[in-house]
Amino acid sequence: MYPNSRYILPSLDERTAYGYKQVDPYTKLFEDRIVFLGVQIDDASADDVMAQLLVLEGQDAERDIIMYINSPGGSFTAMTAIYDTMQYIRPQIQTVCLGQAASAAAVILSAGTPGKRLALPNARILIHQPVVASSGYGQASDIEIQAREIMRMREWLEKTLAQHSNKSVKQVSKDIDRDKILSSEQALEYGLIDQILVSRKAGLGKK
């Protein structure tokens, strides 16, 4: 049994005017205006992503930001925080799905700048209705409040996915009743992405 099965990120030695400094791959990506969302979406990861987006806007509001996504999804409210920040800042955002963009991460993928939402050939995109943990206990009025909030979240999700795809709200509502798993080709047809990237060697990819 391995004591630590997680891949260890290498550090890079970089020469500066003050000598050498060690940086990790994520720092190098950030220097190239790349934000990597590779974890579950929760309050902590949302804060990290929002901070990076705001800093990059402050550095240059005219240059694009690239967001790579490989995430199983997560918190609805954390997702909406990232979503609102993406809509708020001035730079255009290219979103690229590597691996998977499930649940909340699928919304983030679709919210990239139109024409700049991409996925690799074997990427997996999953959409479904909001999932909210509930004990099922409490006063009737509290349960009613929770039910109304769940419906509000679902309505927001339906309208938002319809806005960022080529489907109607009615169709999205039907599709998210159960897990809907899309290949990159299916996500392209659905309108959640604009292009499939095959290889940098072959150019941008295919429509």
UniProtKB/Swiss-Prot annotation:
The reaction(s) this protein catalyses:
Hydrolysis of proteins to small peptides in the presence of ATP and magnesium. alpha-casein is the usual test substrate. In the absence of ATP, only oligopeptides shorter than five residues are hydrolyzed (such as succinyl-Leu-Tyr-|-NHMec, and Leu-Tyr-Leu-|-Tyr-Trp, in which cleavage of the -Tyr-|-Leu- and -Tyr-|-Trp bonds also occurs)
State the UniProt keywords alphabetically: Cytoplasm, Hydrolase, Protease, Serine protease
Q: What's the protein name? A: ATP-dependent Clp protease proteolytic subunit 1
Looking up PROSITE patterns in the UniProt record yields: CLP_PROTEASE_HIS (PS00382), CLP_PROTEASE_SER (PS00381)
Q: Name one GO cellular component term.
A: endopeptidase Clp complex
Q: Please explain the role this protein plays, according to its UniProt record.
A: Cleaves peptides in various proteins in a process that requires ATP hydrolysis. Has a chymotrypsin-like activity. Plays a major role in the degradation of misfolded proteins.
Please state the protein's primary subcellular location.
Answer: cytoplasm
- List the molecular function annotations (GO) for this entry: ATP-dependent peptidase activity; ATPase binding; serine-type endopeptidase activity
Q: Does Protease appear among the keywords?
A: yes
Looking up InterPro entries in the UniProt record yields: ClpP, ClpP/crotonase-like_dom_sf, ClpP/TepA, ClpP_His_AS, ClpP_Ser_AS
PANTHER family given in the database record: ATP-DEPENDENT CLP PROTEASE PROTEOLYTIC SUBUNIT, ATP-DEPENDENT CLP PROTEASE PROTEOLYTIC SUBUNIT-LIKE-RELATED
Self-association state and partner proteins as the record states: Fourteen ClpP subunits assemble into 2 heptameric rings which stack back to back to give a disk-like structure with a central cavity, resembling the structure of eukaryotic proteasomes.
Q: Which family does it belong to?
A: Belongs to the peptidase S14 family.
GO annotation, biological process: protein quality control for misfolded or incompletely synthesized proteins
- Which compartments does it reside in? Cytoplasm
Tell me which Gene3D superfamilies the record gives.
2-enoyl-CoA Hydratase, Chain A, domain 1
Q: What are its E.C. numbers? A: 3.4.21.92
